[in-house]
Amino acid sequence: MAHSENMKVTSIVFKPTATVEEEGTQIWLGTSSGEIHEIDIINQQLLKTKSAHRREVIKLFRYASELWSLDESGELVIWKKSSSGMPSLDQQTNSFRVPRGHTFSIACGEQLWIATGKDIRVFKPSARSDEEFQVLRSPLNQLNTGDVTSGATISSHSDFVYFGHTDGKVSIYNRRDFSCAGVINVSVYKISSLAGVGDYLWAGYNTGMAYVYDTSCTPWKVKKDWRAHEKQICSILAEPSAVWNLNRLQVITLGTDNMLRIWDGMLEEDWLDTRMHERDSDFCSFRELKVAVMTWNAGAVKPSHVHQQYMSQDNNFLRDYMVDQGSPDVLVFGFQELVDLENKKVTAKSFFKSKKKDPAEQEHMSHQYRAWRDYLTRCIEDFMPADNKYVLLHTASMVGLFTCIFVKGSLRSRIKHVHTSEVKRGMGGLHGNKGALVLRMVLDDSSLCFLNCHLAAGQTQTIHRNNDIAAILEAEPFPANPLSQDSSVAHTDIFASGGDGSMIMDHEICIINGDLNYRIDTMGRDTVIKHVKENNLPRLLERDQLLLSRKKNPGFRLRAFAEAPITFAPTYKYNVNTDDYDTSEKKRAPAWCDRVLYRGLGKV
């Protein structure tokens, strides 16, 4: 349709019509010059134009048979229905003033909620006077929340309005008494868009990630998350009319990458996948697989030191560990700090000379890893039952991280598609002193993924650790299905939740081990040690950062993982060669830094 080059459309709304058959045939367009254009979509004609505002029309709202237009100066114009039963650009209007600085607004029935930064005000545009128009005398706001960026309502919770904030929080207000029903911390990233879809709340982030939340439970449950766009998601729109027109519920996302994408609002594939997993025992045969996973921050110790008298307890530890396991099918050894990460010379070399590595230094590090591989091989030969031969499946290393996996010889021929990768998290993802080694394999028709992690250190770095594990789990370290041209595993049902195997969470069974570095919050060292001596572990676990994040943070990626009950004393941090907690100058408080977590969709 022809238009002037200077015309910039800044807002749009479908015009109410007199009959249902005419619905969706006409639109109003607000422009940067303050004009409103009425367009006949069917005939592609400009019906009317009116200079309704002096400033840019930033929003157009629809309520019943009325339309409301808001400009950037804060002028709100009310277009009531005419004798024809629908609003007209020719009729007389009412206007009100609202504060400038609009960051978000949403029409909820006869109410208009307008946010300016952190403040939210509620108005009644159909009012006849200024007193009736301003519903609240003072704005709504909550301490420690960022600016409002987005908002939505959910049909199953129609009494509430949900607002997204720049700091990843969602505030919830009651539409009847305007009380704050809660503030939920769902992410550390900026929420750029919200939409109510059925019973769920969809959220778009400045990272391009989309999340679907079930808000009916406490804490909220993440039903699904995925990378919807390469850049920020600026809008999410549910299209309920598609239910009767196309027999599906469509959700449209628009990103600043100039891409518009359409998603299944019913999450049908996920629903089917869940139902199928519930019935898989009816159609599949299963064999139990015993996997022994050990995680150890070895503090740069060498295998040769383990044999020395003052380290005999460590030597016995490995012997006792293997004997206690019986005869597992898979043995996973995950080490952290096989190189001294506190040696600034070593870590600086590995970073600054990453392009031109020192051969001598690399040889030293490689020798350390080989020494441990050979030592573990000898331990297995010495301590595991003689009638079960084990073979080395894979080893991997990355600046102190070392993974060594053995499997029974009888199992090796059934294992296909062994792929490995690494995810660096040190120095903003550039350095491997923190991060993860990941291994994927397909055993018969099941996919397994093992992660050996070392996350950010520091008592106060919970958010940093949460970001580390999120980045690791959101990475795409593996080749996608089909795994090879001549693959005997060509079907995609070896992966979970419709995944193609490129991501860690696509695998049916995931096991994380490592020095996750989560500490005990708001409790001094002496108090922690006192509770340890009294065996009052439940009191300490109440303040465990990992467990707290799982309880309070719906977006915490480890919520999808389970963990065996913790019945042992904190594993961090001991004086070298002793059972005494750290008495160095730093005097670090004990904590359960070393963890093993698993996700098995009912199979672990």
Question: Can you describe what each PLM-predicted range is?
Answer:
Residues I27-G30, L67-D71, L112-T116, V161-H165, ...:
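Conserved beta-strand element within WD40/beta-propeller blades
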Residues M1-A2, Q45-K50, G85, D90-F96, ...:
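A short beta-strand motif characteristic of beta-propeller blades
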Residues C234-L237, W271-L272, N315-L318, G326, ...:
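Catalytic lobes of large eukaryotic enzymes
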